[in-house]
């Protein structure tokens, strides 16, 4: 079972509703569902800690491309293995509304995941990938991920965040392989 959920995103109101911050949105939804309040600021992150179960919800505050720095600090202090940390992030290779889990792997071109791989010196950490779709041209990637979802996509995005938060919570309570099978066989 997972011991920490890490949602990737960028800090500050400017980025709050961007596609790149969907990992933060999932963490916020998990915290809401678990009735968690008053997060701490530590490990260069916003952190919710469920002491009874020793579970963490983390939103690195280092900006996306340096997420690994915050996560390395967390791992060094808590001694939680990377394989027990579920990283939640946006994925342009998946259509909007799609959710997929995988046990490990490369960065897939995601700078936040690349930073984590570099800082933790391993690819052996599970991921919960949330589809945000792809822009029409490669030149638009930065603007695309740093812009909000289109209004027409709002209902599906809300439903996706809700569903992703359910998988994240289940990963804290049930074997990851089981949750992964559920996630990857559902039509998300």
Curated annotation (Swiss-Prot):
PROSITE patterns: PEPT_TRNA_HYDROL_1. Its EC number is 3.1.1.29. InterPro entries: Pept_tRNA_hydro, Pept_tRNA_hydro_CS, Pept_tRNA_hydro_sf. Coiled coil: none annotated. The record marks 90 as: Stabilizes the basic form of H active site to accept a proton. One of its GO terms (molecular function) is tRNA binding. Keywords: Cytoplasm, Hydrolase, RNA-binding, tRNA-binding. The record marks 10 as: Discriminates between blocked and unblocked aminoacyl-tRNA. The active site is at 20 (proton acceptor). This is Peptidyl-tRNA hydrolase. The lineage of its organism: Bacteria, Pseudomonadati, Aquificota, Aquificia, Aquificales. The gene is pth.
């Amino acid at each position: 079972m997972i011991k920490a959920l890490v949602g990737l995103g960028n800090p500050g109101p400017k980025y709050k509703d961007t596609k790149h911050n969907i990992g933060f949105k999932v963490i916020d939804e998990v915290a809401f569902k678990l009735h968690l309040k008053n997060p701490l600021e530590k490990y260069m992150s916003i952190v919710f800690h469920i002491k009874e179960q020793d579970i963490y919800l983390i939103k690195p505050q280092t900006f996306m491309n340096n997420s690994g720095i915050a996560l390395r600090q967390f791992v060094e202090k808590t001694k939680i293995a990377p394989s027990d940390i579920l990283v939640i992030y946006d994925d342009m290779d998946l259509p909007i509304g799609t959710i997929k889990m995988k046990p490990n792997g490369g960065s897939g071109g995601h700078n936040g995941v690349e930073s984590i791989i570099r800082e933790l010196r391993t690819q052996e950490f599970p991921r919960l990938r949330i589809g945000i779709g792809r822009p029409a041209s490669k030149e638009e990637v930065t603007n695309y991920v740093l812009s909000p979802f289109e209004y027409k996509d709002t209902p599906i995005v809300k439903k996706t965040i809700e569903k992703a938060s359910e998988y994240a919570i289940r990963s804290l309570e049930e074997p990851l392989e089981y949750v992964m099978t559920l996630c990857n066989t559902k039509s998300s």
